[in-house]
Regions:
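Active-site neighborhoods and metal-handling regions in enzymes and metal-associated proteins
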Residues: 1-207
Length: 207
């Protein structure tokens, strides 16, 4: 919990900085990544980023697990969204947090899909369920608001994660179909940590 609180402070400062400076100075995917790492490092007990930060702007955000390079790096501008899939490693624990930051005014279509993804995340995170449930039996709670729009995303909704170790850690996760090669189908036990990361990805446009 302390790690999540510290990471939330860093992330809130980052979003505030982003929204107040994207139209005043040149900010790119890579420089945004450096800024968030700097803000995390200012938190007591920070050790390192949990994994390579993934900041994807505009059409890049529709490419699952896109990671910016000096060759692909683009400047952030208004009228689009920045997808940030990042995490921090602290002495108290690790985080894996995905956030979408709106810059300026966006289209009605973007608003509709952004809202659907928000509903999806909330449906799953607020769910009450009985002992003995698995991720594959609960995944539909996240997907339903997205399925209602005849959309889907081609990955699991969430995965287990460890403490200053592998950020993708078995034995559980959220996926409505079973992938035999993935050890993610164990029933939930008290104390397990699992991410909640639904999404909509419109190729060539946004995500």
């Amino acid at each position: 919990r302390n790690a999540e609180l510290k990471d939330s402070v860093a992330l809130t400062k980052f979003i505030y900085w982003l929204k107040n400076n994207y139209d005043k100075m040149k900010i790119t995917e890579l420089s945004a990544s450096e800024k968030l790492t700097q803000l995390r490092s200012e938190q007591e007990g920070y050790v390192r980023d949990s994994f390579e930060p993934l900041h994807a702007f505009g059409a890049h955000a529709a490419m699952m697990h896109y990671s910016p390079t000096p060759e692909s790096d683009v400047e952030l501008k208004g009228g689009q969204m920045l997808l940030s899939d990042t995490g921090g490693g602290y002495l108290e624990g690790s985080t894996d947090i995905t956030r979408t930051t709106i810059l300026g005014s966006i289209s009605d279509e973007m608003k509709k899909y952004y809202t659907a993804v928000y509903k999806s995340m909330q449906h799953l995170s607020a769910a009450n369920f009985l002992y003995g449930n698995h991720g594959w039996s609960l995944d539909v709670l996240a997907r339903q608001p997205i399925w209602d729009l005849n959309k889907d995303f081609q990955c699991g909704t969430g995965h287990g994660f460890g403490y200053l170790g592998s950020i993708h850690e078995p034995p559980t996760g959220f996926r409505w179909y079973i992938v035999p090669s993935k050890n993610e189908h164990h029933q939930f036990e008290e104390g397990m940590m699992v991410t909640d990361e639904p999404g909509i990805y419109e190729e060539g446009e946004f995500g």
